[in-house]
Amino acid sequence: MSDSSKTNQCCPTPCCPPKPCCPPKPCCLQKSPCCPKSPCCPPKSPCCTPKVCPCPTPCPCPATCPAACACPCPMKPCCPTKCTCCPKKCTCCPQPTCCVQPTCCSSENKTESDSDGSGQTQDRGAQTQQSPQGGQGNWNQKKTK
């Protein structure tokens, strides 16, 4: 009888941690409130120990970890090394799906760069303007000659 009492004291929380005194059966019964049915937290183990499902590292967080799962996606750098959707000047993006939506990064980038250093903004703007103007200039010169 003393064993039963110890088992109850060992598992006061709805989510039973993996302890020797905590059998997997009662823990499995209460896995619903502990871990909701979401792709973020697959039912690999019978007892879901982590209440908050860990959010994946990649940029498209909502695709892997939906709002149903209680894991907020942290603010990651808007333009990673492998991401070519946003300019390199982009510091961070309020939305986790920055790689999917380049406009999210552009609007944030202009405000951030303008405040941080106008010199960098002008330099980047000059490069952007030179590319299309240079292309048009070549076409005009070829047509003239």
UniProtKB/Swiss-Prot annotation:
Query: Its GO biological process terms?
Result: binding of sperm to zona pellucida; flagellated sperm motility; penetration of zona pellucida
Region ranges (Disordered): 105-145
Q: Bias category Polar residues: which stretches?
A: 116-145
Tissue specificity statement from the Swiss-Prot or TrEMBL entry = Testis. Selectively expressed in the spermatids of seminiferous tubules and in flagella of epididymal sperm.
Q: Could you name the domain of life of the organism this protein comes from?
A: Eukaryota
Membrane topology annotation:
Peripheral membrane protein
Keyword hit for DNA-binding: no
Where located? Cytoplasm; Mitochondrion membrane
Q: Where does it primarily localize? A: cytoplasm
Keyword annotations for this protein? Cytoplasm, Fertilization, Membrane, Mitochondrion, Phosphoprotein
Q: What GO terms fall under cellular component here?
A: cytoplasm; mitochondrial membrane; mitochondrion
> Where is the PTM Phosphoserine found along the chain?
S38, S45, S113, S131
> What function is annotated for this protein?
Involved in sperm motility. Its absence is associated with genetic background dependent male infertility. Infertility may be due to reduced sperm motility in the female reproductive tract and inability to penetrate the oocyte zona pellucida.
Protein's recorded name = Sperm mitochondrial-associated cysteine-rich protein
Write down the species: Rattus norvegicus (Rat)
